[in-house]
């Protein structure tokens, strides 16, 4: 047993009350020795945990004797049981020192997150052994009592659980009220059964094994006696206490229903006769299956009825999922979809209509033994069935849960057994199962002890178990396990292989990343746990009939826990303000703002029935009448499962009403309810609670069985709703009526829209719940969560009717996958596995057919993708509320409050209202003629806020085009009519380029508005504007700030309000208020951006395609500073007339300097220097004077200076240049100024630039090595006179060796070699000689060496080449392989004369084969081949004497080798034909001497693969010339 992160430390930790509610005595008698024995057992079993670290409130260990007609409970029996208790006490005492606290604040690190998951405090393995079944004479020491959060509250009627009359201590807020005496009896009965089962196990372990085997063989036996006894137990009434949430105080007298623990005790007596060793079922039923606080929910049915009470930490009961359709006998208990994270309104849950009349007896019996303690992190492994059992869709019978060894063994409690790494006994389900598993069961983190976490070695052991056998072997026990393991995920973090292989798609919600998932307050994503997908086959869009055919036990999803009353969060209310609304005085408040609605059973029977499922919304200040208390960090909130947002009815209730509350609290000018925040919250709580109660009655779907009877129940429930309205407060009657009507539609839609694809396929009953909610935004209803039923689909195939009187599918929305539009307008969809919706901001209300919001037949319309449907119960999830359709377009409503996330533009805070795109805002303001001043101002403010918040058109044509926003032409599909209004003439930007940037402007406008002397009557208007401008998603700190508004539209609407107010004989006050609102609205939305005129805006938006320069009068400067405007002026100036140029010039002259430094304006100035008249050029030149240095150092001004130097007169050039005197070096080293200096040297007379030469004295080397200065030096060497360049060159020669190797200086040396005098070149070449090899290998110097070889004289070049060739072969070989020097060798080959070329070829030839191995050596070979191909002819045919072709020619052509090169060199005396075949593609080497004779160079050492044949023909008469094709240069082409 462990209390790791459970509820031993919660909000407001008080004393620890340890109650040992032993049922002792006979008919009320209390045995002292029994009390002592029970207290000792409890202290040993539980107390040691808390005794090590008691809470400040002290520890109360009470023994409460409870009598009063508890059947089957007697006094303490034999001393054998007492001895056993003592033995267990000693056993647990030994482990006391090994136990440490697992609280989060004691300094101990919790490395295993699973340790924080709550485990049932009543672990049967730790329970003291009880006696055999009591018959009034022999009992046993009671099991461990409940552990309260605070100290027990003593006194009252009988012993209390967590204290009691005999042992209560402390008064600081235990969880158990003094009126829980009856609950103690029930609890004790259950504990007695657990202790008795443990005792049986101690006595007969062998019998237990035999019984377990028998249970495997007979998993579905149900004894008639047990059934009869269960029914009798249900009919026996015993007072039970109704456990609350909040502070744990009871909120009403218990409803006299016998606790299931007593039923279990009676069942156990029968089971002992037939299955004496079967203790697992008792233990699990006691510990996990049924919680004692839910006993009041048993009236009118068996213990498998829907429990409306608190069945889980932070839960309010649950919303049972709809049963799969099928015959009555095929169904079993249904799965509960618990709405976690909420407070509980547990009053009268017993009036819930029974849900078990359609269950077969075997399912009931098996479910009684069921304790499906499964979590999303621990899927069950199912052994192959032995073929015995009831028939199911799985061949061979159902698969039994894997029996984990070590469970139930007393020795395995405190030591690590085979499957556990945690120091507690892990509960597992019993071998029997009431259904056949076609896949993994629906699970949730219920927080009980059955935890298999992937973070410990358990999973590894499970894997070993799985792979110990071969699933492919037919004889193996694992052969049936493989298809089930494929569908299991041991943790939410585990991704299937398909998820890894496929990319995330917006249509697949499983593509969500972990860090993208918003965790709700209950720890699940969007209110839906990932493992509660809507099919059991990942990747499939439809659930398989074989997997969904069998129902599941009621405790499968969230097995109710013992002591769940301990799990309620402190401070959570139980019913809003209902204690004073419908309570009868017996209700006890359970938290701040929460009142119990218990009351007398007879007086409020119907009330209790309807309020049993009340689920107060989890929103701020609405459902509970207070902010929801912070969830305890020690509570595993993932165990809460899906919250109540899954229910369509509750989704409707909480969001709609919460939005109204939001508007009332934030928009006081628009409020229609009480101004007192507390009163509004109380009214909201009452109305919401009442409406929720009325709606929740119709929420539970009908289980398998008679659908006609379900129809009758629905009618009865509707009658109860009508009766319920009579009990409601006056403030909530109107809302309740609309809420009831909406819930009727929601209930019908929930039944009608089950996920039925084919008639032969079972339905997934909870597809209607896929519209979950995001995590609340500071406790406010989620926004942008549109349920999938907003798109009623048509044209589906007829389905089987759900009821005999139900209509066909033509009136039923065919919902399969919800579609969404994101904030960009893209259509997105949510997958059917989890149904996670997309967050979006509605661009337009087009997802609902036009006729969906009207009662009766719709008006005649053209063909549409989604035809309008009649207003039926199956029409939509959201029906008429507050006179408007929440999900539709409330075009004729005057309500100013509504859902933020609806498509109702007149009520939505996040969708454009009706007044946004149409002129109805003016009409709405005009309707305020007969209203008060505040109302008129509020209407004007609303219109202004709407206009200022959303872009739109104000013209009547645009309004008529869109009418009432889709009443006639808005399509429900993106394929239909446009979903956004056409761009108006006043706006082109439909959205803000910087969302949130306009908040500052809005704030300034509000400050200006506050500064205006408004009369007192305009306070409401001012407050409304402020509230509308600073709503939640439009605040100054929000990124979802309002987009840019349309100019003038808000002011028009407010002005209309002013006119209307003036007509109402309240001219002074109202007109002033409306005028102020109009001014504020106009300032917010109508003011253009500073520096951009309307003309420029229209031009930028291409509204003036034929704009001319003359049309830009008084806008030239503005256009020049704009990118598009500047380009327009530049293009026009090239062909402009003189008058147009003068008009432009006159405007830019005043702002010439600012335009010179402008990023776009400088181009206009340059154009004038280029295409302007001489006078204009000179005038602009005069504007440059006095600013030359500043402009020269400026990025854009330097361009203007350069253009001016090219265009102005020489006199002005000199004037401009002389302004740089004294700043030459500064400009030369500047990234912008160096360009100006270079332009000066290029354009200005060199005589006028002597100051630049003078400034360079002594700075040549430093400037030559400067990235910018080296450029200026080169310009000087190009354009200056010899007298000016001589001192520069002299300094260069002094630093030649350094400059050659400098990254910038080498450019200066190269420039001298290219453009300098010959004497200067010779000086540089001589400095290179003797260093060719070294400098050629330098990155920068190699460039200089190349220039030396290129620009040297013949003698100097010969000297450089000879230096390389005559040195040694190694030098040339190194240069050819070097990455830099190889370029020098190539340059030598290019420019060398034949004598040098001969030397080079002689040196290179031996290394040609080796050069092919080097990247840079290949360049040499390529250069040689390319060079010699120019002087060779591959197809020359030589002729001998008498015109006979030379035989060698044919031989050369036919000597096919890898490559053949035929070279013909003609001289005056003979023709030489050389044919060389080389498999390595070696070229033929032919040297042509200067005297014209040809010399064939034979390979010095030809390779073995080379063959050469050279034939010299006889003498030929040179005067005849060659015979054949025309020759060119004595070479045959």
UniProtKB/Swiss-Prot annotation:
Q: Which residues form the signal peptide?
A: none
Q: Where is the composition biased (Basic and acidic residues)?
A: 103-117, 483-503
> One GO MF term, please?
sequence-specific mRNA binding
The cross-references to InterPro entries, in alphabetical order and at most eight, read:
ARM-like, ARM-type_fold, PUM-HD, Pumilio_RNA-bd, Pumilio_RNA-bd_rpt
Which Pfam families would you find in this protein's record?
Answer: PUF
Region of interest called Disordered, as start-end residue ranges on this chain: 102-149, 207-276, 304-331, 382-452, 470-558, 697-725, 846-912, 975-1008, 1494-1533
Q: Which domain of life is it from?
A: Eukaryota
User: What, per the annotation, is the impact of changing residue 1167 to A?
Assistant: Disrupts RNA-binding
* One GO term describing the cellular component: neuromuscular junction
Q: What is the effect of changing residue 1346 to K?
A: Disrupts RNA-binding
Family annotation (PROSITE patterns): PUM (PS50302), PUM_HD (PS50303)
Q: Where, subcellularly, is it found?
A: Cytoplasm; Cytoplasm, Cytoplasmic ribonucleoprotein granule
The UniProt annotation puts the region (Adenine-nucleotide binding in RNA target) at: 1126-1130, 1198-1202, 1270-1274
Subunit and partners? Interacts with nanos (nos) and brat. Acts via the formation of a quaternary complex composed of pum, nanos, brat and the 3'-UTR mRNA of hb.
> What is the protein name stated in its UniProt record?
Maternal protein pumilio
User: What organism is recorded for this protein?
Assistant: Drosophila melanogaster (Fruit fly)
């Amino acid at each position: 047993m462990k209390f790791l992160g459970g509820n031993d430390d919660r909000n407001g930790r008080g004393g620890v009350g340890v109650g040992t509610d032993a049922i002792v005595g006979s008919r009320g008698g209390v045995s002292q020795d029994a009390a002592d024995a029970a207290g000792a057992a409890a202290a040993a079993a539980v107390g040691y945990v808390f005794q090590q670290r008691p809470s400040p409130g002290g520890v109360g260990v009470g023994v409460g004797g409870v009598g009063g007609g508890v059947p089957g409970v007697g006094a303490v029996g034999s001393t054998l049981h007492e001895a056993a208790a003592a033995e267990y006490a000693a056993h647990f005492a030994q482990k006391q020192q090994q136990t440490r606290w697992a609280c989060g604040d004691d300094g101990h690190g919790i490395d295993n997150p699973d340790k924080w998951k709550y485990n049932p405090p009543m672990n049967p393995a730790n329970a003291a052994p009880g006696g055999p079944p009591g018959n009034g004479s022999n009992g046993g020491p009671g099991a461990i009592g409940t552990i309260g959060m605070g100290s027990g509250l003593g006194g009252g009627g009988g012993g209390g659980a967590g204290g009691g009359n005999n042992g209560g201590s402390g008064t600081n807020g235990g969880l158990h009220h003094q009126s829980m005496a009856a609950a103690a009896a029930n609890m004790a009965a259950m504990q007695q059964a657990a202790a008795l089962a443990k005792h049986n196990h101690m006595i007969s372990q062998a019998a237990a094994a035999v019984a377990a085997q028998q249970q495997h063989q007979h998993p579905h036996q149900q004894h008639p006696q047990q059934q009869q006894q269960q029914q009798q137990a249900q009919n026996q009434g015993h007072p039970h206490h109704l456990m609350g949430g909040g502070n744990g105080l009871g909120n009403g007298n218990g409803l006299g229903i016998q606790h299931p623990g007593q039923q279990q005790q009676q069942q156990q007596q029968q089971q002992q006769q037939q299955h004496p060793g079967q203790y697992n079922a008792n233990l699990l039923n006691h510990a996990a299956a049924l919680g004692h606080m839910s006993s009041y929910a048993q009236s009118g049915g068996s213990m498998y009825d829907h429990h409306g009470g608190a069945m889980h930490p932070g839960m309010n009961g649950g919303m049972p999922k709809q049963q799969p359709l099928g015959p009555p006998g095929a169904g079993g208990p249904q799965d509960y979809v618990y709405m976690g994270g909420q407070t509980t309104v547990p009053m009268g849950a017993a009036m819930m209509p029974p849900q078990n009349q359609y269950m077969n007896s075997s399912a009931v019996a098996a479910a009684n033994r069921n304790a499906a303690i499964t979590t999303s992190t621990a899927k069950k492994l199912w052994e192959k069935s032995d073929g015995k059992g009831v028939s199911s869709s799985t061949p061979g019978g159902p698969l039994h849960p894997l029996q984990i060894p070590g469970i139930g063994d007393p020795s395995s409690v405190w030591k690590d057994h085979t499957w556990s790494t945690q120091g507690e006994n892990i509960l597992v389900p019993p071998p029997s199962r009431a259904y056949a598993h076609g896949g993994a069961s629906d699970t949730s983190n219920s927080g009980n002890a059955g935890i298999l976490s992937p973070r410990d070695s358990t999973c590894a052991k499970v894997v070993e178990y799985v792979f110990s056998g071969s699933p492919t072997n037919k004889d193996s026990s694992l052969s049936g396990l493989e298809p089930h393991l494929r569908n299991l995920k041991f943790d939410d973090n585990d991704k299937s292989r398909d998820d890894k292989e496929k990319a995330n798609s917006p249509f697949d919600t499983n593509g969500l990343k972990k860090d993208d998932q918003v965790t709700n307050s209950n720890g699940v994503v969007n209110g839906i746990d990932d493992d509660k997908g809507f099919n059991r086959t990942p990747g499939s869009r439809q659930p398989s009939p074989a997997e969904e055919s069998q129902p599941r036990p009621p405790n499968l999803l969230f097995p109710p826990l013992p002591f769940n009353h301990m799990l309620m969060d402190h401070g959570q209310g139980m019913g809003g303000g209902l204690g004073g609304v419908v309570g009868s005085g017996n209700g006890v408040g359970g938290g701040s703002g929460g009142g119990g609605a218990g009351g007398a059973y007879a007086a409020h029977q119907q009330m209790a029935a309807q309020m049993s499922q009340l689920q107060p919304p989890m929103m701020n200040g609405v459902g509970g009448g207070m902010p929801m208390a912070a969830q305890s960090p020690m509570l595993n909130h993932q165990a809460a499962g899906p919250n109540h947002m899954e229910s369509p009815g509750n989704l409707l209730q909480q969001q709609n009403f919460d939005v109204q509350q939001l508007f009332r609290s934030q928009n006081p000018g628009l409020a229609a309810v009480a101004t007192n925040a507390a009163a509004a919250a109380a009214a909201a709580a009452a109305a919401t609670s009442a409406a929720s109660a009325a709606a929740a009655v119709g929420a539970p779907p009908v289980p398998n069985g008679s659908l006609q009877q379900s129809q009758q129940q629905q009618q009865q429930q509707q009658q109860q709703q009508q009766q319920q309205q009579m009990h409601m407060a006056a403030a909530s009657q109107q809302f309740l009526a609309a809420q009831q009507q909406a819930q009727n539609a929601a209930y019908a839609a929930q039944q009608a829209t089950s996920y039925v694809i084919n008639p032969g396929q079972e339905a997934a009953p909870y597809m209607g719940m896929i519209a979950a909610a995001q995590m609340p935004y500071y406790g406010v209803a989620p926004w942008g969560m549109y349920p999938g039923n907003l798109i009623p689909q048509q044209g589906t195939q007829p389905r089987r009717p759900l009821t005999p009187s139900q209509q066909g599918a033509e009136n039923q929305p065919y919902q399969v996958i919800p579609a969404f539009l994101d904030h960009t307008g893209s259509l997105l969809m949510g997958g059917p596995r989890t149904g996670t919706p997309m967050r979006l901001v509605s661009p337009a209300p087009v997802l609902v057919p036009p006729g969906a919001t009207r009662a009766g037949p719709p008006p005649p319309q053209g063909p549409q993708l989604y035809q309008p449907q009649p207003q039926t119960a199956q029409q939509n999830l959201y029906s008429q509320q507050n006179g408007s359709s929440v999900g539709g377009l409330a075009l004729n409503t005057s309500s100013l409050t509504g859902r933020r996330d609806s498509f109702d533009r007149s009520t939505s805070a996040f969708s454009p209202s009706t007044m946004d795109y149409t002129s109805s805002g003016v009409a709405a303001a005009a309707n305020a003629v007969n209203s008060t001043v505040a109302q008129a101002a509020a209407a004007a403010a609303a219109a202004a806020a709407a206009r200022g918040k959303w872009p739109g058109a104000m013209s009547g044509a645009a309004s008529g085009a869109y009418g009432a926003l889709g009443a006639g032409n808005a399509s429900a599909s993106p394929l239909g009519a446009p979903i956004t209004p056409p761009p108006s003439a006043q706006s082109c930007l439909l959205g803000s380029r910087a969302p949130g940037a306009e908040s500052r402007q809005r704030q300034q406008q509000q400050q200006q508005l506050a500064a205006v002397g408004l009369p007192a009557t305009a306070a409401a208007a001012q407050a409304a504007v402020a509230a509308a401008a600073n709503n939640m998603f439009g605040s100054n700190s929000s990124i979802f700030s309002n987009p840019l508004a349309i100019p003038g539209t808000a002011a028009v609407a407010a002005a209309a309000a002013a006119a209307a107010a003036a007509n109402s004989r309240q001219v002074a006050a109202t007109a002033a208020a409306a005028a102020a609102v109009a001014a504020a609205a106009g300032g917010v939305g109508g003011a253009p951006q500073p520096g951009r005129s309307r003309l420029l805006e229209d031009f930028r938006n291409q509204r003036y395609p034929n704009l001319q320069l003359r049309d830009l009068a008084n806008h030239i400067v503005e256009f020049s500073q704009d990118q598009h405007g500047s380009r327009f002026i530049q293009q026009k100036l090239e062909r402009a007339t003189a008058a147009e140029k003068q008009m432009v010039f006159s405007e830019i002259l005043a702002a010439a300097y600012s335009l010179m430094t402008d990023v776009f304006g400088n181009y206009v100035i340059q154009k004038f220097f280029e295409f302007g008249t001489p006078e204009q050029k000179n005038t602009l030149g005069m504007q440059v004077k006095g600013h030359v240095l500043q402009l020269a150092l400026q990025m854009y001004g330097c361009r203007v200076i350069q253009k001016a130097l090219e265009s102005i007169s020489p006199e002005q050039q000199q004037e401009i240049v002389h302004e740089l005197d004294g700043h030459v070096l500064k400009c030369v080293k500047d990234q912008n100024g160096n360009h100006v200096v270079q332009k000066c040297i290029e354009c200005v007379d060199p005589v006028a630039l002597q100051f630049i030469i003078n400034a360079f004295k002594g700075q040549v080397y430093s400037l030559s090595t400067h990235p910018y200065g080296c450029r200026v030096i080169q310009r000087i060497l190009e354009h200056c006179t010899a007298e000016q360049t001589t001192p520069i060159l002299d300094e260069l020669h002094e630093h030649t060796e350094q400059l050659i190797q400098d990254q910038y200086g080498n450019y200066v040396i190269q420039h001298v070699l290219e453009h300098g005098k010959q004497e200067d070149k010779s000086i540089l070449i001589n400095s290179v000689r003797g260093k060719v090899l070294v400098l050629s290998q330098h990155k920068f110097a190699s460039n200089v060496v190349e220039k030396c070889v290129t620009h040297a004289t013949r003698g100097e070049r010969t000297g450089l080449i000879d230096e390389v060739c005559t040195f040694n072969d190694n030098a040339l070989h190194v240069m050819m392989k070097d990455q830099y020097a190889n370029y020098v060798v190539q340059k030598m080959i290019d420019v060398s004369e034949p004598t040098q070329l001969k030397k080079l070829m002689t040196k290179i030839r031996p290394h040609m084969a080796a050069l092919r191995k080097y990247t840079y050596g290949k360049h040499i070979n390529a250069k040689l081949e390319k060079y010699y191909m120019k002087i060779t002819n591959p197809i020359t045919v030589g002729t001998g004497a008498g015109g006979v072709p030379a035989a060698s020619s044919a031989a050369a052509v036919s000597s096919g080798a890898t490559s053949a090169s035929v070279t013909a060199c003609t001289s005056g005396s003979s023709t030489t034909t050389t044919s060389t075949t080389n498999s390595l593609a070696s070229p033929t080497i032919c040297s042509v001497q200067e005297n014209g004779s040809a010399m064939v160079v034979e390979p010095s050492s030809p390779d073995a693969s080379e063959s050469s044949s050279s034939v010299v023909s006889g003498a030929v008469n040179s005067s005849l010339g060659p015979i054949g094709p025309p020759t060119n240069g004595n070479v045959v082409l």
